From Swiss-Prot:
Signal peptide residues on this chain, from the entry's feature table: 1-18
Lineage: Eukaryota, Metazoa, Ecdysozoa, Arthropoda, Hexapoda
Catalysed reactions, as listed in the record: ATP + H2O = ADP + phosphate + H(+)
Gene symbol of the encoding locus: Hsc70-3
Chain residue ranges for the region called Substrate-binding (SBD): 420-500
Coiled coil: none
Name this protein carries in UniProt: Endoplasmic reticulum chaperone BiP
PROSITE patterns membership: ER_TARGET, HSP70_1, HSP70_2, HSP70_3
Post-translational modification: AMPylation at Thr-518 by Fic inactivates the chaperome activity. In response to endoplasmic reticulum stress, de-AMPylation by the same protein, Fic, restores the chaperone activity.
Native species: Drosophila melanogaster (Fruit fly)
Gene3D superfamilies assigned: 1.20.1270.10, 3.30.420.40, Actin, Chain A, domain 4, Substrate Binding Domain Of DNAk, Chain A, domain 1
Length: 656
């Protein structure tokens, strides 16, 4: 059995040889690996036999998953967006990953929107984000916000590689359901990326850990606690074969929840001391959020930290101490809750604690000493491995998988065997969940089962597809449904309806039903129609994304041409005012002529802050036309050549 699975998966990771493959690899170009995180994202590429984690334009190897829209029409993504959160909280969007692929009625969505500074609205039974842009209020699907972050990672990679990138491997939490996986793929399409593979974050981290491990078979537990999600996966690693044995987790648990506990504590404390409730003041809340996050990070290395915020609320300052002990007390139940999935994974894998050879901690929240201590104690004092960077491991593994798919050298020995995280089945009489594919089944996989009708002469059966672990479908998650019609009249129990489930390498499900008597067949790819974007939606969002990119480009051109004129005018003004330099060489008439032209340009700038780039360029040319002859005359008098002007003619001069 294992051999068959291995063969299937070897085919799936694209390890076939021959000319056809080489041609295909050329078409793909360089495939990048992206860790699309709740709070931070990271991008890597496999080049020349090694992984490069790529720094963004700020020099940072991780980029905040933040998007902001400013009052002057600028769209900011990453560090720039996060840096202005406290001054523009209503139009700074984060945590899109906590909304993506979820329904409006989801209890987690309803919990989260109470704490977001931006407005979340219902549209087509799904959460959408409403912000003010320069064109007025605009509503975005979570997929669009995630697409903007993916687009930023794509740009970061393109700047490093010096060429366009069109294909990517994107990671998701292992416990993401079908709808969340589909929505993440859609976000990639909107960003102009073909997502070749969705892989699970702990699996990617295991690749990062185990890539160079050659010492025989090892059982590795990956404990991945990030900013917004938590996963545990147990893998067997053996000479380049990565087999996921079991996985579990919580798609709504992470560093942000720890921050929120601390914030709630300080908000209550402030109300008790000052009698003031800051919850309605978005700016104050976001200032507190920023400082609490910093304090949490500091407490990983020290035992207490002082939180100081000037002009916190209604002119008052904020000054409080947070100790590591208090931080742990506020979050102890959440920290302890991470051990339940660890226990579950061991049970599902039919292993004991002592069977685990290595524990790999991934995600920024595993830097919290108490989390490390709890994991260590759970495994009887076993020290977790510290060989990989918890912030970069997932992107690293994604980049390796991207290298495999694009046929990079030295990757042909890597085989990835992942599993589906949740049981999948259909509803049968009485609302019973009949399982077809149990959780932790190696994917890709296909499973069929024959069913029959529940009543005499029934000519239609409705196939309702669910995922979840509960015995009754009402307690599980409906993925989609379809009808098989035209069943010939027959007593109940006679017709034979074969239902087949097929899960692809991305963990995405296709279901078909066939009437064995007539050969009549229906099938659907589960796209969670109520939840999923339609192809029309995606096309519209792609157009919107392109429009935003054009607007960003135009804005950049406008800002650059404005800056050129401004710097030129002020630089001249300063030089003319300098009595030791240019100011001393000009006659009063020349000085007055230049000052008058410069003042006119500065006045025009103040009156036209949003002019077109061409207008700024024309103003600069006009100013140069007045300035250049005066300066040229000075240089000729001194027997030298005039300095190059700032206009187009500068390019014609010989270069040294």
């Amino acid at each position: 059995m294992k051999l068959c699975i291995l063969l299937a998966v070897v085919a799936f990771v694209g390890l076939s040889l021959g000319e056809e493959k080489k041609e295909k690899d050329k078409e793909l170009g360089t495939v990048i690996g992206i860790d699309l995180g709740t709070t931070y994202s990271c991008v890597g590429v496999y080049k020349n036999g090694r992984v490069e984690i790529i720094a963004n334009d700020q020099g940072n190897r991780i980029t905040p998953s933040y998007v902001a829209f400013t009052a002057d029409g600028e769209r900011l993504i990453g560090d720039a967006a996060k840096n202005q959160l406290t001054t523009n909280p209503e139009n700074t969007v984060f945590d899109a990953k906590r909304l993506i692929g979820r329904e409006w009625s989801d209890t987690n969505v309803q919990h989260d929107i109470k704490f977001f500074p931006f407005k979340v609205v219902e549209k087509n039974s799904k959460p959408h984000i409403s912000v003010d842009t320069s064109q007025g209020a605009k509503v975005f699907a979570p997929e669009e916000i995630s697409a903007m972050v993916l687009g930023k990672m794509k740009e970061t990679a393109e700047a490093y590689l010096g060429k366009k990138v069109t294909h990517a491997v994107v990671t998701v939490p292992a416990y993401f359901n079908d709808a969340q996986r589909q929505a993440t793929k859609d976000a990639g399409v909107i960003a102009g990326l073909q997502v070749m593979r969705i892989i699970n974050e702990p699996t990617a981290a295991a690749i990062a850990y185990g890539l160079d491990k050659k010492e025989g078979e090892k059982n590795v537990l990956v404990f991945d606690l990030g900013g917004g999600t938590f996963d545990v996966s147990l893998l067997t690693i053996d000479n380049g074969v990565f087999e996921v044995v079991a996985t579990n987790g919580d798609t709504h648990l992470g560093g942000e929840d720890f921050d929120q506990r601390v914030m709630d504590h300080f908000i209550k404390l402030y109300k008790k001391k000052k009698g003031k409730d800051i919850r309605k003041d978005n700016r104050a809340v976001q200032k507190l959020r920023r400082e609490v996050e910093k304090a949490k990070r500091a407490l990983s290395g020290s035992h207490q930290v002082r939180i100081e915020i000037e002009s916190f609320f209604e002119g008052d300052d904020f000054s409080e101490t947070l100790t590591r002990a208090k931080f742990e007390e506020l979050n102890l139940d959440l920290f302890r809750s991470t051990l339940k999935p660890v226990q579950k994974v061991l049970e599902d894998a039919d292993m004991n604690k002592k069977d685990v050879h290595e524990i790999v901690l991934v995600g920024g929240s595993t830097r919290i000493p108490k989390v490390q201590q709890l994991v260590k104690d759970f495994f009887g004092g076993k020290e977790p491995s510290r060989g990989i960077n918890p912030d970069e491991a997932v992107a690293y593994g994604a980049a390796v998988q991207a290298g495999v798919l694009s046929g990079e050298q030295d990757t042909d020995a890597i085989v990835l065997l992942d599993v589906n995280p949740l049981t999948m089945g259909i509803e049968t009489v009485g609302g019973v969940m009949t399982k077809l594919i149990p959780r932790n089944t190696v994917i890709p996989t296909k499973k069929s089962q024959v069913f029959s009708t529940a009543s005499d002469n029934q000519h239609t059966v409705t196939i309702q597809v669910y995922e979840g672990e509960r015995p009754m479908t009402k307690d599980n998650h409906l993925l989609g449904k379809f009808d098989l019609t035209g069943i010939p009249p027959a007593p109940r129990g006679i017709p034979q309806i074969e239902v087949s489930f097929e899960i692809d390498a991305n963990g995405i499900l296709q279901v078909s039903a066939e009437d064995k008597g007539t050969g009549n067949k229906e099938k659907i790819v589960i796209t969670n129609d109520q939840n999923r974007l339609t192809p029309e939606d995606i096309d519209r969002m792609i157009r919107d994304a392109e429009k935003f990119a054009d607007e960003d480009k135009k804005l950049k051109e406008r800002v650059e041409s404005r800056n050129e004129l401004e710097s030129y005018a002020y630089s001249l003004k300063n030089q003319i005012g300098d009595k030791d330099k240019l100011g001393a060489k000009l006659s009063d008439d020349e000085k007055n002529k230049l000052e008058s032209a410069i003042d006119e340009s500065i006045k025009w700038l103040e009156q036209n802050p949003d002019a077109d780039p061409e207008e700024y360029k024309k103003q600069k040319k006009d100013l140069e036309a007045i300035v250049q002859p005066v300066i040229a005359k000075l240089y000729q008098g001194a027997g030298g050549a005039p300095p190059p002007e700032g206009g187009d003619d500068a390019d014609l001069k010989d270069e040294l």
